[in-house]
């Protein structure tokens, strides 16, 4: 059996918008990663760039379960003394986009295509986004956090 390779005409990049209000971080990240890779399409091929554009709004209202508020997110600049440690509680106030981008990045494959797919992810703190001319489809995540209820 031959490997299926989608034609360039089949490689359309649709736009989706996801509301992150009271959605658990891991559930949001897995759904976003599936959409970014294009696994929701019948023409999916792991080696082809068939992913979609994903817009996540209300990033500051995301739900973190367990003890993640005390957990830290590390990054290093590569320079001496360049280690940066931020707790999730600090990041939720200052930069909630970084929490979501890092979670989605961890769920994408570790290859060259992952950078292209991650560039199609756009995360916004509030409910407004500048991508209304693209007419994104609303993508509902069924399960919201039990803590929010």
Swiss-Prot record:
CDD domains: Ribosomal_L13. Disulfide bonds: none annotated. Gene3D superfamilies: Ribosomal protein L13 (3.90.1180.10). GO terms for molecular function: mRNA binding; structural constituent of ribosome. It comes from the Bacteria. GO terms for cellular component: cytosolic large ribosomal subunit. The keyword Transmembrane helix does not apply. InterPro entries: Ribosomal_uL13, Ribosomal_uL13_bac-type, Ribosomal_uL13_sf. GO terms for biological process: negative regulation of translation; translation. Keywords: Ribonucleoprotein, Ribosomal protein. The keyword Ribonucleoprotein applies. Part of the 50S ribosomal subunit. This protein is one of the early assembly proteins of the 50S ribosomal subunit, although it is not seen to bind rRNA by itself. It is important during the early stages of 50S assembly. Belongs to the universal ribosomal protein uL13 family. This is Large ribosomal subunit protein uL13. It comes from Bifidobacterium longum subsp. infantis (strain ATCC 15697 / DSM 20088 / JCM 1222 / NCTC 11817 / S12).
